[in-house]
């Protein structure tokens, strides 16, 4: 027998502290919709062009398909480890647990650049004067990193309440802003953005879909709060659906308004959108005046901060859950703050590593490019996490639910398998694209993108399977218990 970590016996996360609404905005804030509107949609528009709204819709539907796995698992498992615990508990030997955890660590250690480096990139795009001050971006990185620690450290109730309040306001600004722009467009409104492209533009359109999928990353993170949600087996799945719907409401109308607002607002052809500094802000200023311009700036900045808080909540609980299981992380990562009942050790370790990594790459490539390089890894790694969990759902259904008469061919076999195939296609297309780009334009930056894609794939395949083999061979007793904790 292996002695259980002390933390599991003496202290637990604060059960009942998170309501359904707060859980919804844990996921919604991770998406960072205002930041997507202001900045991240650039990648989608660069490839999908006028069909960007359709690309967003397709990506949203694909992510909805990926949400089936956490929705189904949340009915049967209440564990802060989320996809890690779902995957680990899918089989008796827990084989998928280490694979899922390593994959997710790849996203954990790279995706935070959206907040830590993205904030500086956004502010720099607003003001050439500010961007000209050497190393000022490091100050912004320090500020947001400290914020990302303090609010989650003080308690899950405080951090989720902050995200719920600001998230509702952010949603209203985006929806109302989009509606006003659409109304002001008048006869310029068109169905063209929803027309499926033809000919040589089809490939570019689907690459735009790939970028759009990244916009919805994090919608499943409410599952990391499952141990803190009262009656979580009912409320988590409800929160997942609501968050997914709200993300679509926030981004789909906004993408339509921005695309047509740009092409009809005197800014030139849509091909110039991706190369413009903060085009979302330019469109808001054109149609909503200084008030709309300032509001989008305020809520975009807040979007980076709320994303950071949501990210810290999620990552710290994943690492806490794994440390509790004694998988990869040492016991001290699984200790909770005695008063706040938050995984403060996990928060400090993760943010410390993340900050150092972001600053190093920021010094080499600049904050904006470094952030995009790291986000490339985050996208590949999180897709791998979904793929492992999808496989886990099928195995769990076969091994457990089938015997209980609860297995579903559609939800547990067809849907997750389809989602996994889509994930494989996305990773393949990303690799093929980066190879093509580098060989047509062999710059050091394009080389960095190609290297990070290859590294990300190897991280999952070699790192993940290697760790899985290690636990199955050397520590099978730990692998078997991984992910089995259930707060309910």
How does the language model describe each region?
Residues 137-185, 199, 217, 240-245, ...:
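Membrane-interface loop-to-helix entry segments
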Residues 162, 331-341, 383-436, 446-450, ...:
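C-terminal membrane-solvent junction of multi-pass transporters and transport-like membrane proteins
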Residues 9-10, 14-16, 53, 130-136, ...:
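Helix-loop-helix junctions that connect adjacent transmembrane segments
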Residues 103-119, 216, 221-228, 290-330, ...:
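Membrane-helix boundary/coupling elements in multi-pass transport proteins
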Residues 1-51, 64, 68, 470-488:
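Membrane-interface "cap" regions at the ends of multi-pass membrane proteins
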Residues 42-53, 121-137, 156-167, 295, ...:
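Transmembrane helix-loop boundary segments of multi-pass membrane transporters
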Residues 85-92, 125-129, 239-308, 328-378:
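TM-loop-TM module centered on a large, flexible mid-protein loop between adjacent transmembrane helices
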Residues 36-132, 448-463, 475:
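Extracellular loop-to-transmembrane helix junctions
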């Amino acid at each position: 027998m292996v002695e259980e970590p002390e933390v599991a016996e003496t202290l637990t996360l604060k059960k009942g502290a998170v309501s359904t609404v707060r859980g919804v905005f844990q996921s919604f804030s991770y998406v960072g919709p205002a930041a997507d509107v202001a900045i991240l949609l650039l990648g989608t528009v660069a490839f999908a062009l006028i069909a960007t709204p359709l690309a967003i819709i397709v990506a949203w539907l694909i992510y909805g398909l990926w949400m089936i796995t956490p929705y189904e698992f949340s009915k049967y498992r209440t564990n802060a480890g989320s996809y890690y615990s779902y995957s680990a508990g899918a089989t008796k030997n827990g084989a998928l647990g280490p694979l899922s955890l390593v994959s997710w660590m790849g996203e954990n250690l790279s995706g935070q650049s959206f907040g830590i480096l993205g904030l500086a990139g956004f502010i720099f795009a607003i003001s050439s004067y500010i961007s000209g001050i050497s190393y000022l971006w490091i100050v912004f990185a320090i500020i947001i990193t400290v914020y990302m620690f303090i609010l989650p450290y003080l308690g899950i109730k405080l951090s989720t309440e902050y995200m719920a309040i600001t998230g509702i306001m952010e949603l209203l600004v985006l929806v109302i802003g989009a509606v006003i722009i659409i109304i002001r467009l008048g006869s310029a409104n068109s169905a063209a953005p929803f027309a499926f492209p033809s000919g040589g533009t089809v490939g570019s359109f689907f690459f735009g879909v790939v970028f759009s999928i990244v916009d919805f990353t994090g919608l499943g993170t409410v599952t990391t709060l499952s141990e803190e949600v009262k009656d979580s087996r009912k409320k988590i799945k409800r929160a997942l659906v609501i968050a997914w719907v709200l993300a679509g409401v926030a981004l789909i109308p906004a993408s339509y308004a921005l695309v047509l607002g740009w092409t009809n607002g005197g800014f030139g052809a849509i091909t110039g959108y991706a190369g413009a500094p903060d085009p979302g802000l330019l469109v808001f200023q054109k149609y909503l005046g200084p008030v709309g311009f300032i509001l989008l700036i305020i809520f975009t900045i807040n979007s980076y901060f709320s994303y950071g808080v949501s990210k810290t909540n999620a990552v710290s609980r994943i690492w806490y859950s794994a440390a509790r299981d004694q998988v990869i992380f040492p016991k001290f990562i699984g200790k909770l703050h005695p008063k706040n009942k938050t995984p403060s050790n996990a928060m400090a370790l993760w943010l410390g590593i993340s900050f150092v990594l972001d600053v190093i790459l920021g010094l080499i490539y600049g904050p904006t490019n470094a952030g995009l390089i790291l986000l490339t890894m985050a996208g590949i790694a999180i897709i791998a996490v979904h793929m492992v969990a999808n496989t886990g759902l099928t195995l769990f259904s076969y091994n457990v639910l089938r015997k209980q008469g609860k297995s579903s061919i559609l939800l547990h076999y067809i849907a997750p398998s389809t989602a996994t195939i889509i994930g494989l296609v996305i990773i393949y297309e990303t690799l093929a694209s980066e190879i093509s780009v580098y060989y047509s334009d062999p710059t050091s930056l394009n080389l960095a993108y190609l290297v990070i894609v290859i590294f990300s794939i190897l991280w999952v395949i070699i790192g993940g399977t290697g760790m899985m083999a290690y636990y199955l061979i050397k520590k099978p007793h730990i692998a078997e218990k991984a992910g089995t904790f259930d707060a309910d």
